[in-house]
Amino acid sequence: MKLCVTVLSLLVLVAAFCSPALSAPMGSDPPTSCCFTYTVRKLPRNFVTDYYETSSLCSQPAVVFQTKKGRQVCANPSDDWVQEYMDDLELN
C-alpha cells in the first residue's frame, strides 16, 4: 500500500513539473503574430483575400492582410483604406 501511494505521488509530481500547461498561468503564452512596422503603400484591393487583427498582447495594433499569393502584409488599423478593406471583406 505504501508503495502505491509513493508511486502515485511521484507520478503527480512529475506530471506537474513536466507539463507546461499545468505549470504556466493561463494566458501567459506570447502572441504568435505581431507587426512592428506597417506597409507604407495601399495594397490593390483585388490582391487581398482575407485579414485578421493581431493580438491585444502585441506592442502595437495591426491588421494583417492575406494576399492571393499567400503573403501577409501588416497595415495600420487607423488608416481609412484599411478600415474600408476590412468592411468590404466582412461583407463578402
Curated annotation (Swiss-Prot):
InterPro entries: Chemokine_b/g/d, Chemokine_CC_CS, Chemokine_IL8-like_dom, Interleukin_8-like_sf
N-terminal signal peptide: 1-23
Coiled coil regions in record: none
Compartments where located: Secreted
GO cellular component terms, semicolon-separated: extracellular space
GO molecular function annotation: CCR chemokine receptor binding; chemokine activity
SMART domains for the chain: SCY
Disulfide bridge partners, by residue number: 34-58, 35-74
GO BP annotations, alphabetical order: antimicrobial humoral immune response mediated by antimicrobial peptide; chemokine-mediated signaling pathway; eosinophil chemotaxis; inflammatory response; positive regulation of cell migration
Main location: secreted
Keyword tags: Chemotaxis, Cytokine, Disulfide bond, Inflammatory response, Secreted, Signal
Keyword Signal appears in the UniProt entry: yes
One Pfam match: IL8
Function field: Monokine with inflammatory and chemokinetic properties.
Family membership: Belongs to the intercrine beta (chemokine CC) family.
Oligomer and partners: Homodimer. Interacts with CCR5.
Protein's name in the database: C-C motif chemokine 4
Organism listed in the record: Sus scrofa
